[in-house]
Amino acid sequence: GSTNQAGEDSRNVARFAALLAGMPVTVPGQTVNRLCASGLGAVIDSARAITAGEGELYIAGGVESMTRAPFVMGKAESAYSRDAKIYDTTIGTRFPNRKFTDQFGAHSMPETGDNVAEEFGISREQADTFAAASQAKYQAAKEAGFFEGEITPIEVSQGRKLPPKQITEDEHPRASSTFEALSKLKPLFE
């Protein structure tokens, strides 16, 4: 799964990864792009294919580097136009489609989150309380060994001078997250 395909991995990072890993050209690669949860979508697609008897072994996961998302130039709105618009593709639509945005808006996922919170009356305090509780539940599950069978440890090179780093767990959850710490974070939008 990959959200914002750009760079040297081209548009089909799954195929590139399979070939560069030494898989024969007869092994297909399929990149899933559903924006949020692309990696999880790839895992679900693989599980579904195994369940349906379409194969016995699938390699699935997610890759993303939003910091490398490109700035892009939209097409001119009229012939010989000199008013090129540049779009930051890190968050939001790469090339806004006016028909779509006029009907549905052009909100990014964080903006949509704020809109939903406003619509349902979810305060910042309630959101931070939920987020802190979610982090605490993850930490308790991790300490109980709940995730031990779900992540296969891998070694990642750190260059010639350092030994490989062993990756054994998800990097995002933060054991130190508290309501107080979260409430000090500046909101992205007002």
Could you describe each region identified by the protein language model?
Residues 15, 114, 139:
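Short glycine-/small-residue-rich flexible loop motifs, especially phosphate/cofactor-binding loops
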Residues 9-10, 70-71, 165-170:
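Short, well-ordered secondary-structure micro-motifs
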Residues 126-190:
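N-terminal extracellular/periplasmic Venus flytrap/periplasmic-binding protein-like
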Residues 57-115:
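Flexible glycine-/small-residue-enriched beta->alpha junction loops
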Residues 3-5, 63-66, 159:
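Short glycine-rich anion-binding loops that position phosphate/pyrophosphate groups of nucleotides
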Residues 3, 114-122, 187:
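A broad detector of the eukaryotic-type serine/threonine protein kinase catalytic domain
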Residues 2-58, 90-92, 103-109, 176-190:
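Conserved catalytic cysteine-centered active-site region
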Residues 34-64, 117-146:
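Active-site-proximal alpha-helical scaffold in enzymes
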